[in-house]
Design a protein with these regions (language model features):
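Structural signature of transmembrane alpha-helices in multi-pass secondary transporters
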Residues: 21, 28-29, 57-60, 64, ...
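Helix-loop-helix hairpins in multi-pass membrane proteins, especially solute transporters
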Residues: 76-207, 395
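Extracellular/periplasmic helix-loop-helix junction of adjacent transmembrane segments
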Residues: 38-67, 103-108, 307-312
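Hydrophobic transmembrane-helix bundles of small-molecule transporters
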Residues: 167-280, 286, 304, 311-312, ...
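12-transmembrane solute porter fold
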Residues: 14-37, 50, 126, 243, ...
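Central cavity-lining transmembrane alpha-helices of secondary-active solute carriers
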Residues: 58-72, 123-127, 314-326
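Helix-breaking motifs and short loop linkers at transmembrane-helix boundaries and internal kinks
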Residues: 45-47, 79, 100-106, 169-170, ...
């Protein structure tokens, strides 16, 4: 029986460990949102275009999506602390490279590749170590609450902090800020211990990791090519689909042969979970698509600077934080299906308000009501969608499904900046802005349709995070704000 008694106050050493893990989540969430307000400054300084910055942001999110599951698998083989520290170093090198980037190519190498790889290596250990170091439900919930709070602050305040740094110093200073935070985390990490030994003999599906990552990259690059070459777009998307089909066929063959694949196909056999994954993907697509589109429009078409753009986005930040803080109370009163549908309804309404008011008024205040509605909607539905997915599986599959869940969310983020951003940068006019936002609204309606097909009865969250009637041990893991929760730890494999 799990001991739910309140644990003693954590000693200073444990608090420093938690600070290291929470700051790691903060900086990764910050990196996912702060660049949107630097579009003009980066474009002007590096002699590139809005599309160039869009590619860098999209690829960063895509690299996270493609490598989050492999990153979680590597922790079993090489150890959680080693992967955590390696990820921090890789991330810091990428941030410093961005700070001195002479052109777009180096920025993509530093931000999209190195920071993306670093995030995929360091985020899985954050959640795995928290699960291992805080074994009782109460202390673990408190630890996850601290980590999620810092992650939420990083994601929500990223545009404002990034805008202030860019306006006061330079966009390059924002990357130096990231490197400094990483240095603090490395110092705090000296007290981090790994309760489980690494298992160098544990198999790793290298072929599966390469195939899945290649397929996702080809599809997203195809979307980015849409405004330049339609035939190239079609070719890349078709090729990506073929590579992913190859990945799933290879995975099935490995399972039949008794080998451990990158991802178990059993995760896709539950209808409720599949619908939940769709809603997660669409939610993050809406969030990042709207963020990039509105930020680019404000800076390029309206001519606003980074700090003014960041201030406007505080409306969405406040909305998201308000409903996120009320998530537990809402879950006790309404089913998860109802909350997800309400979230999509609010978010789509927010997009419609953004299109209507921005077309009618030139004041910055025209953006506030729509962004507030979108923030309120996202805050209502993000956690219920994760709970729907997590609670569909027993304890032994929680690790794999949580990794898949976060990868799907990050993939939605990259789709959002790719799809909406591509439509916007094709014209950079009011018409292109409206077209991008309407496209997001239509995709949001598709998410609403998926949510409507979720089961009606299950979903009210019982104490501990599991829906009422869920099997013991299926408590949903706390979700990440913008970069995924990894697979939970496994005991070392023995041949």
């Amino acid at each position: 029986v799990t001991d739910r008694a309140a644990p003693a106050k954590a000693p200073p050493g444990e608090r420093r460990v938690l600070a290291a893990l929470a700051l790691a989540q903060f900086i990764c969430s910050f990196a996912g949102s702060n660049m949107n307000v630097m579009i003009n400054d980066i474009s002007r300084d590096l002699g590139t275009t809005v599309q160039g910055v869009q590619i860098s942001i999209t690829l960063f999110l895509l690299v996270m999506a493609a490598l989050m599951i492999p990153g979680g698998k590597l922790t079993d083989r090489y150890g959680r602390k080693r992967c955590f520290l390696t990820g921090l170093v890789v991330y810091a090198v990428g941030a410093l490279l961005c700070a001195v980037a002479p052109g777009l190519g180096v920025l993509i190498l530093g931000n999209s590749i190195l920071e993306g790889v670093g995030t995929a290596l360091l985020i899985p250990p954050v959640y795995i170590l928290t699960t291992l170091l805080y074994p009782d439900v109460t202390s673990r919930a408190r630890a996850f609450g601290v980590i999620m709070a810092l992650g939420g602050i990083g994601a929500a305040a990223g545009p404002l902090i990034g805008g202030l740094i860019t306006t006061a110093v330079s966009w390059r200073a924002a990357f130096v800020f990231q490197a400094l935070v990483i240095a603090v985390i490395v110092g705090l990490s000296r007290r981090v211990r790994d309760p489980l030994p690494p298992d160098p003999e544990r198999p790793f599906d290298t072929g599966g990791a390469v195939l899945s990552a290649t397929g996702l990259v080809l599809i997203v690059m195809g979307i980015l090519a849409a405004d330049n070459d339609l035939r190239l777009m079609i070719a890349l998307i078709l090729l990506g689909a073929l590579v992913l089909a190859w990945f799933f066929r290879s995975t099935r063959a490995k399972e039949r042969a008794g080998r451990e694949p990158l991802l178990s196909l059993a995760l896709f056999r539950d209808r409720t979970s599949n619908l939940g994954l769709i809603t997660q993907n669409v939610q993050w697509l809406l969030l990042m698509g709207t963020s990039f589109t509105v930020a680019a429009y404000l800076q390029v078409v309206r001519g606003y600077d980074a700090v003014r753009t960041g201030v406007i986005f505080t409306a969405a930040t406040l909305g998201l934080l308000l409903t996120s803080l009320s998530a537990e109370r809402l879950a006790e009163r309404r089913s998860q299906r109802t909350l997800i549908m309400a979230g999509f309804t609010l978010s789509v309404a927010g997009v419609a308000v953004l299109v209507a008011l921005v077309a009618a008024f030139s004041t910055p205040w025209a953006f506030v009501p729509g962004l507030l509605l979108i923030g309120l909607g996202l805050g209502v539905m993000l956690t219920p969608s994760v709970n729907v997915v997590q609670s569909s599986f027993p304890e032994e599959q929680q690790g794999e499904i949580s990794g898949l869940s976060r990868s799907v969310s990050n993939l939605g983020s990259s789709f959002g900046t790719a799809i909406a951003g591509t439509i916007l940068v094709a014209g950079l006019t009011k018409g292109a802005y409206a077209a991008a936002m309407i496209t997001l609204a239509v995709i949001g309606l598709a998410g609403l349709a998926a949510a409507a097909r979720l089961p009606r009865a299950p979903g009210r969250t019982a104490p501990g995070g599991a829906p009422s009637g869920a099997a013991p041990g299926t408590e949903a893991r706390p979700p990440l704000p913008d970069s995924g929760q990894p697979p939970a730890p496994r005991r070392p494999h023995r041949a």
